[in-house]
């Protein structure tokens, strides 16, 4: 299977992956068009509703978070080939019928180019800010129920779903997506996410893992698929990695360690990345174009089929676009 390449474009990135201010609305489309022109396969965006506490402590001004499905409707209207993908859509913050309606509409408008990566979200504080009366909720169970509900809403005429958290009755949700099935990816690194990807997903969307960690995780996904009588070989292994590209290894490493993205990874050490201990340089794409190409081959050998939502180290949108262009010109052709 040829390796697919995706780039994370500005949605909910200020203050976490990049400084404040970073991207304006008028920066979003040119970044997506650059990706399409260079031959990338997809663009990806994340999902946040309110500012994280660690971001509030670091920055005086609040970040701009652009809602991903609305953003991708705009991007899809102005592109012809790029897939538009979420990494991730935070299901616990959304009503499943509304999420299904939005996703199916976007898949129709884009001509079948949507991939829906979903998960619990890295910051429980954000969920509790939106739902202060539901602080004891088990978000993993909510995501399991949500993925099952979405599958049914995408395919069945009339749906009643009475789960622990997801509950609705006699809902007809039309139009259906163009794609059958609309790809649903399970986002996260935890063992429960690997089980979820195997049982319910079309893809596994982890973050910042080494090739060997990916190899072991993909085996877990395939075993979970087999237990659910599904074909694990058809599940896309799609990690999200940070890219720090430079003319030399030292230059790329220096940029990475001084970046807002590095600080973001440190913040995730208490949530998404809690099972990893340091070693970010071995779990991302850092170095010259030649070194990065070699590292990608190691990921490919470990079973990776998509590099999802690559996050390019930068302090400005121009720097980000320059890094995307360098990757597109000097790394991407090695895999075409």
Where does each model-flagged region fall?
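Flexible, glycine-rich active-site loops centered on histidine and acidic residues
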Residues: 2-23, 91-160, 208-215, 219, ...
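Hydrophobic faces of well-ordered beta-strands that scaffold small-molecule active sites
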Residues: 5-9, 43-45, 83-86, 114-118, ...
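Alpha-helix-loop-beta-strand connector modules within alpha/beta enzyme cores
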Residues: 57-84, 142-149, 153, 227, ...
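Short, acidic/polar
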Residues: 22-35, 99-102, 186-196, 288-298
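N-terminal beta1-alpha1-beta2 module of alpha/beta enzyme domains
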Residues: 1-78, 180-182
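Conserved, mostly hydrophobic/aromatic
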Residues: 35, 39, 47, 75, ...
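Active-site mouth loops of central-metabolism enzymes
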Residues: 11-26, 88-97, 177-189, 243-246, ...
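An alpha-helical appendage that flanks or caps ligand/catalytic pockets
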Residues: 9, 36, 136-173, 211-305, ...
